[in-house]
Amino acid sequence: MKGVNIYKPLDRAAPVARFIDGLDPKLRDKLIHWLIELPNTPKASLKEPHFKHFALERYRDLYELRARGKVLVRVIFTIRPNGEILLLHAFIKRQSRDTMQALEQAVSIMTQVRDHPELATEYTVKEEGT
């Protein structure tokens, strides 16, 4: 079943969910719109400017959802073999090196989830404007 899952450490709230909830309402609504559409979007349609698929071997399983408002917001995610989306890491891009740091963190999280599947929980995307 396709859906959106989110990385949630056992001892605290899901970092990506907290990040999204803390955004400016207009930008949050834009990001949530893309998250609602994401499970039904074919891989071939995940192209710039709203998405980026990383080509380097180490990051080839990772994608980036891009939203722009007053700031540049990025959400790193992967598509699991069963078609589910797994949101790994979110950040505000201020410098080009921010992406590399986020990718490294996303790879680390992906490894944790592979070893401990219970760290991936269903993410209920709130409807826009709520």
Give the role of each language-model region.
Residues M1-L72, P81-I85, I92-T130:
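Basic, Lys/Arg-enriched alpha-helical interface segments
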